[in-house]
Amino acid sequence: MKPTTISLLQKCKQEKKRFATITAYDYSFAKLFADEGINVMLVGDSLGMTIQGHDSTLPVTVEDIAYHTRAVRRGAPNCLLLSDLPFMAYATPEQACENAAIVMRAGANMVKIEGGAWLVDTVKMLTERAVPVCGHLGLTPQSVNIFGGYKIQGRGDAGQMLLDDALALEAAGAQLLVLECVPVELAKRVTEALSIPVIGIGAGNVTDGQILVMHDAFGITGGHIPKFAKNFLAEAGDMRAAVRQYMAEVESGVYPGEEHSFH
């Protein structure tokens, strides 16, 4: 199997073929996902909550991300692997470059950073130094204390601001964008306005791809279950079948449905 590259996702967008991605944090699950056909994975700072048991992503460190990136890379050597730069790991462009080097050496193909137009210089510096960047707009969990909780973003006038941010990130060199917890109508506008692939989570079925935290996809999330989550394991019966069902429902547009979407 050839390594998956960003060009595959560009082709999917051009051909209007939806694609499924998922978070992964260790060797065994990464191998399972790869074996069942998921070729894009994210080592997310969500590990702070799902793996480490914190109530937010803020305690996660760059070394935490690098550790899990190494494990996932061993399990899925040919996947396109995105890794988050965690809270305060990219406060300046120079700091972003230093920390991106750590996770890239650990096996990442691309780094994901949260924020809008204020990141333009950072995105430029990273891409000029051969570090591919995935942006992240909407509900950005590292900003939970600014937002006052995990709330829907991009309603009303904020929608145009988010679209402007997305265009600015693309112009700066970002090659992917994650949209989290935004109205379907806004997600559609952003996806159509950008030439780069847009991956949604809580953004309806109008984006180019979808991502889920693996614990949500398997129904093993403790505490609050997000509206956009679906327990594929409950219907499928085993983990491999659940992964295949998740992929099939994303690719056909069945998931996410109206019950998983915001307006």
UniProtKB/Swiss-Prot annotation:
<keyword id="KW-0808">Transferase</keyword>
<dbReference type="InterPro" id="IPR015813">
    <property type="entry name" value="Pyrv/PenolPyrv_kinase-like_dom"/>
</dbReference>
<feature type="binding site">
    <location>
        <position position="112"/>
    </location>
    <ligand>
        <name>3-methyl-2-oxobutanoate</name>
    </ligand>
</feature>
<keyword id="KW-0479">Metal-binding</keyword>
<feature type="binding site">
    <location>
        <position position="84"/>
    </location>
    <ligand>
        <name>3-methyl-2-oxobutanoate</name>
    </ligand>
</feature>
<feature type="active site" description="Proton acceptor">
    <location>
        <position position="180"/>
    </location>
</feature>
<dbReference type="GO" id="GO:0000287">
    <property type="term" value="F:magnesium ion binding"/>
</dbReference>
<dbReference type="GO" id="GO:0003864">
    <property type="term" value="F:3-methyl-2-oxobutanoate hydroxymethyltransferase activity"/>
</dbReference>
<dbReference type="InterPro" id="IPR003700">
    <property type="entry name" value="Pantoate_hydroxy_MeTrfase"/>
</dbReference>
<feature type="binding site">
    <location>
        <position position="114"/>
    </location>
    <ligand>
        <name>Mg(2+)</name>
    </ligand>
</feature>
<feature type="binding site">
    <location>
        <position position="84"/>
    </location>
    <ligand>
        <name>Mg(2+)</name>
    </ligand>
</feature>
<feature type="binding site">
    <location>
        <position position="45"/>
    </location>
    <ligand>
        <name>Mg(2+)</name>
    </ligand>
</feature>
<keyword id="KW-0460">Magnesium</keyword>
<feature type="binding site">
    <location>
        <begin position="45"/>
        <end position="46"/>
    </location>
    <ligand>
        <name>3-methyl-2-oxobutanoate</name>
    </ligand>
</feature>
<dbReference type="InterPro" id="IPR040442">
    <property type="entry name" value="Pyrv_kinase-like_dom_sf"/>
</dbReference>
<comment type="function">
    <text>Catalyzes the reversible reaction in which hydroxymethyl group from 5,10-methylenetetrahydrofolate is transferred onto alpha-ketoisovalerate to form ketopantoate.</text>
</comment>
<comment type="subunit">
    <text>Homodecamer; pentamer of dimers.</text>
</comment>
<keyword id="KW-0566">Pantothenate biosynthesis</keyword>
<protein>
    <recommendedName>
        <fullName>3-methyl-2-oxobutanoate hydroxymethyltransferase</fullName>
        <ecNumber>2.1.2.11</ecNumber>
    </recommendedName>
</protein>
<comment type="pathway">
    <text>Cofactor biosynthesis; (R)-pantothenate biosynthesis; (R)-pantoate from 3-methyl-2-oxobutanoate: step 1/2.</text>
</comment>
<comment type="similarity">
    <text>Belongs to the PanB family.</text>
</comment>
<dbReference type="Pfam" id="PF02548">
    <property type="entry name" value="Pantoate_transf"/>
</dbReference>
<dbReference type="GO" id="GO:0005737">
    <property type="term" value="C:cytoplasm"/>
</dbReference>
<dbReference type="GO" id="GO:0015940">
    <property type="term" value="P:pantothenate biosynthetic process"/>
</dbReference>
<keyword id="KW-0963">Cytoplasm</keyword>
